[in-house]
Structure formats: structure tokens, C-alpha cells
Amino acid sequence: MNVIVTISSLLPESGGTSRASTQLCSALAPLGVNIELLSLDYGSRQGTPLLPPAELVNTRLLPCHYSRRLRLLWAPQYKRALTAQARELRGGLIHDNGVWQTTNHVAALVARKFNLPLIVSPHGMLEPWAMRYKSWKKRPAWDFYQKRDLQTACLLHATSAMEARSLRALGLRQPIAIIPHGVETPPPPGAPAPRHGPRTALFLSRVHPGKGLLHLVEAWSQLRPAGWRVVIAGPDEDGHCAAVRAAVRAAQLDEVFTFTGPVEGQSKWELYRQADVFVLPTFSENFGVVVAEALACGVPVITTKAAPWVELQSHRCGWWVEVGTEPLAQALHEAIALSDAERSEMGEAGRRLVLERYSWSKIAADMRAVYQWVLGRASQPACVGECP
């Protein structure tokens, strides 16, 4: 089975989309799926892309030119490369990741030109909050090309029932496969270090207006718990880090909040393991890979009902609260009031949940079944159906 996977960026700063896409490709390859991964090369100044192992996936990064002044991306070599690969594709499909970008429109154009099945994974970019954010740009793009591109896809991939319902609300009527992201298994921990110093509440994600960090600052300002600190880890986006730092200064919490910037690899896993509670007070999340990663490391999680994590309640491994300062403050108060042993027990319940339901091998098997069905080689899999 031959699949061309397309995505605009494999840079870590692109968040969960780039990481999930490369990990899915790596997990599909051992199942007999021949993957050609196409993305853009933004140059070494933008960072090191997240690449799947070369022995599993053939990855091509095509040069692009970006004008910050005009906010325009030009990537003619990308279109030529995708066109050439699509022309030679036999019995395969295109699986595109994301929306709005030049690469997404090119994938739809090429799929139509060669009459190839197109699967689109929006990765939460069509959630209501995301659609409202910078809507002055998105509304014209939706009317001009994005709606039609999505309508011509033969199948949409949602990572949760909540995201699937959002896609239906936009009038998209083709089949939807509901397959969550998988979770990378963290490396084995070393010997536990003795606990000294303050306990830690960790936020690890893009520092972006949609992540609710200002609510976290406000909630912490109300509580001001003794013996606790907050670590904010992740890349700055749209200059939002300056706004968060300003809020921290205004609340006189400079000595409590630490900003680490982007973290990857072993440093990321160490931050998770050092945390006593993980906090993601998001306005919009189609899945929330960082929630699953924290649980995989045995850390209880606080997140909002804008993320599809009702399992935090049903499996007693965290708090699933309404968006806003007051619900967040209440959840933080409850988490801080627990003993280390009680939080550890919740974290262990979360770790079991992730290992049982979110392994990449299971996720890849479900996606392969979807590919087979789209290509007419198998019956409809259970993950494709009506939105619950």
C-alpha cells in the first residue's frame, strides 16, 4: 500500500501536529504501508525538523520562501514534487495534515488532478475557538478554497468525537474516522531522586493565546500556595510569552514562575517526571498530546472541557473542568491539597489508561484499516461511523 503524507512543517514549534504525523508514519511502516512524507524546509535558522527514521520512511523537505512582511509562503518545488509523486502513485492515496496552509491547498489540487483519494486530518484547526482566532484571515480562505478542498476529501480524520462534531457543524458530510493520537512511550526513568524543594505544577505546550496561560496566572495569584512553583515550557507563538510574563510580574509572582523555552527529547521527559501536577488550561484542543504524555509519565492532569479528556474523571487520574479562572483555581486547590502519595496514585491510574488505549501500534493499525477501506480493499472499520 502506497501513501503520500503531506504536512506544512515538521518543526517542533509546530506543536503536536508535526510530532503526531511523524510518529504515525513511523508506526505505519512496519505494517506494510509504504510512506512518502513531504514537507517544507524552512532553513536551519528555524530549528531542526522532527524526522521519522530514514529506514522506515522516505522524507523529502522541499525549500520554500516566506515573506514575513507580506505573510506569504511560496513553495513551487513542493507542488512540482508532489505532482511528480502523485503521477507515479499506483493504488494509493494522499493523507494531508492540517488546513489553511499552501501545502494543504496543493495537496487537494493534486489529488483532484490525478483522481486520488484524499484524507485530511485537520488536527483541531477547525474547532470553534480556532476558527474565531484570526478569523479575518480564515474566513476569506474558507470561502475561497478551504471549504471546497475539505468537501472533496473522501474522508476526514478526527482525533476525538468532539472534533468530529465540530467538523459536522461546518457542513462537512463525508465519512469521519475517529482515531486519537498515539503516545510515545517515555524512556525508562532512572532511580527516583529524593524529594527536596518546592512541588511543581507544569505547563508544557506552545505559549499561545489559545492555551489559557493568563487564566493560570490569575488562578495562581488567587491561591498563592506555599511550597509550590510553576514551570512554563514551550515555544513562544505570536509573541504571547511577553503577555504572560507581564501578567506574572503584575501579580508579583516572578519568583514562582519559571519559563524554560522549548524543550525536546530527554529534557522534556525529565520535566514531566519532576512535575507533581500537569496543567493545560486550554481554550481549544482536538486531542492534547501533552495530556497523554504527562499521564504516561504518571503525572495527574488538570485540563478543561475544551479538550476531549473526560477520562480524567472516569479513570480518576485528573480534573476536567470548565474553561475559566475560577474552575481552574478550584482544581488547583484540590490537587495541591492532596498528599504526594495520593497524587502518585492518580498518576499511576493515568499511566495505565494511556498504555492500554493510546499505544502507537494500536493507532497505526486503525489508520491502516481506514486506508484499506478507502482503497476498497476491506470492509468499513469500527472507527468510521456516526459521531457519538
Task: Map each language-model feature to its residues.
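A conserved mid-protein helix/loop that constitutes part of the nucleotide-sugar donor-binding site
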Residues: R19, Q23, R199, F203-Q222, ...
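Glycosyltransferase donor-sugar binding loop
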Residues: D41-R45, V183, L204, R229-R245, ...
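Membrane-proximal helix-turn-helix segments that form the acceptor-binding/catalytic region
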Residues: K113, L126, K138-L155
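A short, active-site helix/loop in glycosyltransferases that binds the activated sugar's phosphate group
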Residues: L150-P175, V183-T185
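Short alpha-helical donor nucleotide-sugar binding micro-motif in glycosyltransferases
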Residues: P262-V263, E270-A275
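Aromatic "clamp/platform" in nucleotide-sugar-dependent glycosyltransferases that forms part
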Residues: F283
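Short hydrophobic beta-strand element within catalytic cores of glycosyltransferases
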Residues: P300-T304
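Conserved acidic donor-binding segment of nucleotide-sugar-dependent glycosyltransferases
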Residues: W319-E326, H333-D340
